Amino acid sequence: MAKETNLVRRVSVKAANKNIQSFNSGDTVNVFVKVKEGEKERVQLYKGIVTKIQGSGAAKSFTVRKMSAGVGVERTFPFASPALDKVEIVNVGKVRRSKLYYLRALKGKAAKIESELVSSKAE
């Protein structure tokens, strides 16, 4: 059984997407998703707040929530998905929960998350 576990671990490490920075729940992120339309493939931007991160290894995924025309839209992305081009962190949110389900009931400015002051490492 130990050999099977090691094999699964090695495969999940190879499947890990290297273009994803580490982020937490409450962070505002830009998710660049590869979309195939007919023969063409383009990259589409999906910007929102990370509401949850779940799973581990190759099954790890995260959910991003955004407001589109006044309607809340949530989309779940697997970390190991080949459709993910890259993930950029826009703001680091200051939250005390790992699952932000309470944002679903909030509207307007109440649904905003306070951001931490982050020093840029430009040098």
From Swiss-Prot:
Pfam families registered for this protein in UniProt: Ribosomal_L19
GO molecular function, one term: structural constituent of ribosome
Keywords, in A-Z order: Ribonucleoprotein, Ribosomal protein
InterPro entries linked: Ribosomal_bL19, Ribosomal_bL19_CS, Ribosomal_bL19_sf, Translation_prot_SH3-like_sf
GO BP: any one term: translation
Any one cellular-component term (Gene Ontology): cytosolic large ribosomal subunit
SUPFAM superfamilies tied to this protein: Translation proteins SH3-like domain (SSF50104)
Superkingdom of the source species: Bacteria
PROSITE patterns registered for this protein in UniProt: RIBOSOMAL_L19 (PS01015)
Function text: This protein is located at the 30S-50S ribosomal subunit interface and may play a role in the structure and function of the aminoacyl-tRNA binding site.
Assigned protein family: Belongs to the bacterial ribosomal protein bL19 family.
Full protein name: Large ribosomal subunit protein bL19
Species this chain originates from: Bdellovibrio bacteriovorus (strain ATCC 15356 / DSM 50701 / NCIMB 9529 / HD100)
